[in-house]
Amino acid sequence: MLKTSIALGFFLTQSLPLNPQVQGVANHLIGVMDTREQAQTNPRIAKVQMTTCAVDFSPKQDSIYLYQEQAIIDRLNQPYRQRILVIQPSADNSTVESKAYKLNNAPNFINFCNKDLTERELNVSDLAESVCTVFLQPIAGGYRGETPPQGCPTNARGAVKITNTIILHSQGMDTSDRGYDSLGQQVWGAQDNVYQFRWQKP
C-alpha cells in the first residue's frame, strides 16, 4: 500500500500522547486510495483518487490535522474536493470526531501531499468554514463513522444537506455520501452501492 512515503514524517514528528483511537483513525486515512478496482466492474463509478497526508500544524494537543484531496485519476492536478480534516476526541469523549474545513486559496494546496512534511505548513488563516463532521467508533478491523442524524448543510448540485457513512477497514475505505434537496429527496450520491476506495499498490 502507498502509505510509507506520505506517513513517515508524521510518525517521526509526533511527540505528544494522543487518544489511541484518534491516532488510529488518522493513521488509517493517511495515504493514497482510489476507486479504480470498483470502476472496472461498474462503469457508473468514476475513477477517483483520494490522497491524505499530515500537515505541519498542531494547535491542540489532542488533535491531528490532515490535508485531503479528491480528483479524477486522469485529472489529478484539478481536484474537485480539498479539505482540512481535524481528527480529535468528540466533546463528550465518547467517539472520534473528524471535522472537515474548506480552505482559503485552495488552488495553492493542490498536490500538497507531494511536499515533505516540513513544507506542508498550515496557518489558521488558511482555514475557511467548517463544512461537516463525521463521528467514528471502533469496529472489528477498523472504524465506522456517520454524519449527525440531521446531516450537514451544503449547496452542492441542488442539495441542501448531505449525509455520509464511512467504514475504515484493512483494504481501505467504503463511503456512501448522499445529497438531499429541501423536500428530503436524494438528488445525488450513492444509491444501493457504496464507493469503494482501496489502497494503491506500489
Curated annotation (Swiss-Prot):
UniProt cross-references to Pfam families, sorted A to Z: CpeT
GO molecular function, one term: lyase activity
Enzyme Commission number(s): 4.-.-.-
N-terminal signal peptide: none
Disulfide bridge positions per record: none
Entry-linked Gene3D superfamilies: CpcT/CpeT domain
Keywords carried by this UniProt record: Lyase
HAMAP family (alphabetical): Chrphore_lyase_CpxT
Family statement drawn from the similarity comment of this UniProt entry: Belongs to the CpcT/CpeT biliprotein lyase family.
Function: Covalently attaches a chromophore to Cys residue(s) of phycobiliproteins.
Protein name, entry field: Chromophore lyase CpcT/CpeT 3
